[in-house]
Amino acid sequence: MANLIRTDHQQHIPKKRKRGESRVFRLKTFGESGHPAEMNELSFRDNLAKLLEFGHFESSGLMGSWSFQLEIQRNPNPLYVLLFVVEEPIEASLNLRCNHCQYVGWGNQMICNKKYHFVIPSKETMAAFLKLEGGGYAFPEKESFSHLVELQGHVLHGFFHSNGFGHLLSLNGIETGSDLTGHQVMDLWDRLCTGLKARKIGLNDASHKKGMELRLLHGVAKGEPWFGRWGYRFGSGTYGVTQKIYEKALESVRNIPLCLLNHHLTSLNRETPILLSKYQSLSTEPLITLSDLFRFMLHLHSRLPRDNYMSNSRNQIISIDSTNCRWSQKRIQMAIKVVIESLKRVEYRWISRQEVRDAARNYIGDTGLLDFVLKSLGNQVVGNYLVRRSLNPVKKVLEYSLEDISNLLPSSNNELITLQNQNSMGKMATNGHNKITRGQVMKDMFYFYKHILMDYKGVLGPIGGILNQIGMASRAILDAKYFIKEYHYIRDTSAKTLHLDRGEELGIFCTIAWKCHHHNNEIKVPPQECIVVKKDATLSEVYGEAERVFRDIYWELRDVVVESVVGGQIEITRVDEMALNGNKGLVLEGNVGMMMNIEVTKCYEDDDKKKDKRIECECGATEEDGERMVCCDICEVWQHTRCVGVQHNEEVPRIFLCQSCDQHLIPLSFLP
């Protein structure tokens, strides 16, 4: 275990691996083909075995474990992290059934014999694991690797069942003190899933940043969660949210016109319209919808270097290139002053474009110049004023108003801003007075998130209309927590050939159909696996290899015996004859022994007891979704605590009556 803590001065190991010697692998390529293993097998279990050959073997016993040292950077200062792989047998699990599988949507999967945990500990979880003593790290006991997977707060923690289904449990980036960014950790996880040939991966998306839930922020901006960049899509929702509800909620929020939103917010909040105008002016493309706004802000935030600045147009001296404009700068500035004075005279009310134009024509006779200025002036800062322009959603006409923002601006010479716009807004030259930082963009993004997306919590008070609709849709988006990614490989043989030629061997895709006696002899068929046999193997040899593979993977098939081929192809006795027939996949018929059937039956009886629990919540949920529930003490129906008014930070009441039972109780007035 001395290799757990390594100094930065260790030399990189030679290409050839010596027995018992630790190796260093590049984080950036770890998991790709040949880095370190050629994971070119057709099954998850075989590729995993190849990968573990390159790991440093840490312990055996009940839970085997391996470690890999991954290099984050070599210069200027070498930086490493440790990746542990811990094998958890079914005997070490608290529950036979996997709750993660149930919540993400594949709870009917057969029970696997093993889980393989992939863990990159954080500094805190590593310290807890190694038990800091006297200023130095003590070597952990071999059996204590079970504690590693139980700790919370790892940089990365995901696990695979032995059939290739898996779950991502934890991912923490730089914000939590890690040396890795969230993107680096996620790239590594996705490479591992791809290289090992995982089947499906599920996750419970609780990712957040600066107080914002990323599945809502990225959902509105990009139409998918943060994990969508790696191919994760809706798996299942909580509180009765279905895929249709989720997609409808996303669509409704993303397509909200900013002009409509601005119109509603004008009378409620001064800051929001000003900020909207600020980012309209920063963008080279018009921001039409709420999706455009958040997408632009995310893009802008990613472009700005840390502690660096970008010019804000609020106090910019903007000019029009005289070669592209037929009016002089002097005439344009005069027209702007006239428009500003016209808006001042109506005491900052909203008036139509035509009214502004008519008032300005008393001083400016050139209607072409007025049209040009009005077109370019909308949502621009002029001196101490913000000229707001919005489409009236009722009258369907453009309206203008003036906002005094002198108290919001930093001290400056407050020069009159003229227009630089060939058609709408072109290149800008800054006087350097007002700068926008990466942190300011994040702060403004949180402001929009809080005051627009999350207003159902009453940030702006009890208001109705469009903001309430946005709040309800945002709640539905947040209640969609479980996302999945399905990895498609050649082993999914619904439309592919039976075998793959491997020289003297054949890779055969097959599965075993067996009767579950507890469920009225229901036929259960696990996903196909690739078994490798010689080209001239007999059917009995195929049966034997299939038994070995499926016994190793599934707890319910630990003593399965294959008896025949489904379909009754009795005349076929050799595998090469079967290959010549061009079958699409081999389905074998098997039986499970009596003792195993008793254990399986007991397991299913426990499942049935859980299924007998009546769940009838007002949100529409009819089964457990991982959220907290409470049971009525009279009708014994379970409901979400949130749906019955119990706040998240409140304890579940010891005695609880649902609304229906509470209304039907007869007052016992004769009791003292």
Swiss-Prot record:
In closed flower buds, especially in anthers. GO terms for biological process: anther wall tapetum morphogenesis; cellular response to brassinosteroid stimulus; microgametogenesis; pollen germination; pollen wall assembly; positive regulation of DNA-templated transcription; positive regulation of programmed cell death; reproductive process. The keyword Protein transport does not apply. It is found in: Nucleus. Keywords: Activator, Metal-binding, Nucleus, Transcription, Transcription regulation, Zinc, Zinc-finger. Changing residue 643 to G: Impaired fertility. GO terms for cellular component: nucleus. Changing residue 627 to K: Normal fertility. A zinc finger (PHD-type) spans 614-664. Transcriptional activator required for anther and post-meiotic pollen development and maturation. Seems to regulate inflorescence branching and floral development. May control tapetal development by directly regulating tapetal programmed cell death (PCD) and breakdown. Implicated in pollen cytosolic components and wall development (e.g. exine and intine formation). This is PHD finger protein MALE STERILITY 1. The gene is MS1.
